[in-house]
Amino acid sequence: MTKALKNNDGFFERESTQKLLFWLVLAAGIFARVYRFGLVPNGLNQDEAFAGYEAWSLLNYGIDTAGYHNPVYLTAWGSGMNALETYLMIPFIALFGLKVWVIRMPQLIVACLSLPAAYSLVKRTVDRRAGLMAMFMLAICPWHIILSRWGLESNLAPGFLLFGLYFFVRAAENERYLLLSALMYGLSLYTYATIWPFVPVIILLQLIYCMAYKKLRFSRYLLLFVLILFIMALPLLLFLLVNYGYIDEIRTSFFSIPKLLYMRSSELSFDEKAKKLELLGDIFITQNDKNIWNSPEKYGLFYYITMPFALFGLIFCIREFVIGLRRHEYRPASMLTVQFIVGLPLCLLLKANATKINILFIPIVIFAALGAYFLSTVTHRRVLTGVACIYAALFIGFEVYYFTDYDEDTRAHFSYGLEQALEIAEEKGEKIYIDQNEFYTKVLFYTQTPVDVFRNTVQYLYYPAPYLHALSFDHYYFWVSPYQPEDAAAYIMPIDSDTGLLEEEGFTFEYCGCYMVAYKENGE
């Protein structure tokens, strides 16, 4: 640790002040994530709907939509879906039923736990004030607030990687924490398939670094660490063998290793590197991946003032690593860079958006906090207070925007009003026709169609396919336009649809959020 980092005293160095700030920041971060939870975003995303429906099916019927018992990886759309969030949803669904806020609980809990984890990690690698700043920056970060409030399964990855790193750093002081680190890193493999090649590299580099400085040694805890990781990774290794055709799929009454309809390995390649770097640059510079459900254009992923601080913080961590090498000293701040540097090649393997490269974002937020903190150590400690005040003002502005304009702007993407539209249609029609652009997974979720009924009645547009599109199941039909409207049917369509033919046929219309329902009274 540099001398400058040790020479901060005054009001913010008082233990009572820092404890108060810790609880204030944690409370503000949790409030930003739980206020109107389940209502904003208002509606349901197709992937979280599928994860929730699969959890409900596994809980009540013992199989998923592909007929597998407890699969290690969900078949879902045809080309697969990460399974951990689905399994984490099951206890909440068992307690409270299949509801939107219920299936978002795992993401909320992991996000809230990430706040004290970031504090504790940076406190141990730098110091307490830096830890408070890291926690504060993550607590108010637009990207992290947004991901915490809906249930995209891939967005669990940053949290579990953070937990894995935190317990690994603790293991340098007490080897017993290696067991928890192995558990967190092992679980991270079930959050996002894209990180499979990178997690072993992250772990290996951390092991080499700590063993080089004699912070870890060959012991029973290290052996257990490796054993736990191997056991947790083994089902996924078998999954790869199954899907590359080396062994048959595995079906048992306890768990399954499925053969997917389509393996998306072709999505990972080093082709079009220039285009991928351009996309990455756009995300880092504009902080906008053009997907409003990930990145609010008005404020950016991390606020637009953040990247210079992040660059400064990255330089600080690299500097710590270099100083440690020269002096042959253990510098735990060096490990903060490992996940970021190892994750960078990911950007060359796929076309980036905020979800696909999400493992880079918590390190970026921590770097930004360290950049602001280190700037205060080489200038004046009040600089950190000033920076925090600017961010607090941005946070207040973002919160107002998030619960007003942003809520309105995202409603169509989350199919706001579809649940109510389906309820009306169920009362008014024997058959229900739904606009073909609607995702069938949302209909499954809201109607809670038994999985055996779905499996026995579903008709797909193309089968097999990497992204299955249902034409119909049970009494639900996904149609282009009502060429010849049926009197006994109800029609659900976007609110801006052409209704001329239905009006001519004497249909009645009811409006629900982004949808309208057309039907004939008494089916006449």
Which residues fall in each region the model found?
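Short extracytoplasmic/periplasmic juxtamembrane "stem" segments immediately C-terminal to an N-terminal membrane anchor
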Residues: 51-58, 254-262, 411-425
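Membrane-proximal, lumen/periplasm-facing interface regions of secretory-pathway glyco-
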Residues: 74, 306, 384-427, 436-447, ...
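Short hydrophobic beta-strand segments
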Residues: 427-437, 486-494
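Aromatic/acidic, Gly/Pro-rich catalytic loop(s) in extracytoplasmic/lumenal soluble domains
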Residues: 457-524
